[in-house]
């Protein structure tokens, strides 16, 4: 997780701008590619872990980024392979370069029913699929 939120904002803004140029739901076309399988989990981890550990939320104004996540969240492969939010937070909280969580919060996360943040806070207009 980056320590510099301004750098993160610039990177997310550039990604949103790039995604706005696509006419397909995924980076290489109408279905998931290897590239999407690299990018989507990283964005999802950022969304979940940064929210809990740093209080950072991806701005709703990044509508193309949210649309991209929306397509990922609705793809069966992504949904089946995505870890629960609690596992993502515990993974990142255990790293030396991220904020730690209290023992009480750690124990609570391990006992909770698994949650999956697949909701979209912005309007995610589906991309037009070209044949």
Report the location of each language-model feature.
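GST-like fold's C-terminal all-alpha helical module
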Residues: 1-83, 129-130
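Low-complexity, compositionally biased segments
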Residues: 7, 19, 39, 88, ...
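C-terminal transmembrane module of eukaryotic multi-pass membrane proteins
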Residues: 64, 74-94, 101-106
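Eukaryotic N-terminal low-complexity, Ser/Thr- and Lys/Arg-rich leader segments
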Residues: 93, 97-131
């Amino acid at each position: 997780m980056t320590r510099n939120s301004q750098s993160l904002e610039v990177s997310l803004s550039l990604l949103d701008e790039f995604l706005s140029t696509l006419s397909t739901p995924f980076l290489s076309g109408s279905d998931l590619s290897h590239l999407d399988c690299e990018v989507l989990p990283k964005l999802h981890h950022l969304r979940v872990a940064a929210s809990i550990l740093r209080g950072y939320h991806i701005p709703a104004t990044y509508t193309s980024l949210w649309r991209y996540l929306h397509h990922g969240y609705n793809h069966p492969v992504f949904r089946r392979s995505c870890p629960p939010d609690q596992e993502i937070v515990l993974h990142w909280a255990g790293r030396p370069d991220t904020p730690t969580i209290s023992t009480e919060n750690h124990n609570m996360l391990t006992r909770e029913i698994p949650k999956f943040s697949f909701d979209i806070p912005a309007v995610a207009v589906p991309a037009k699929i070209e044949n």
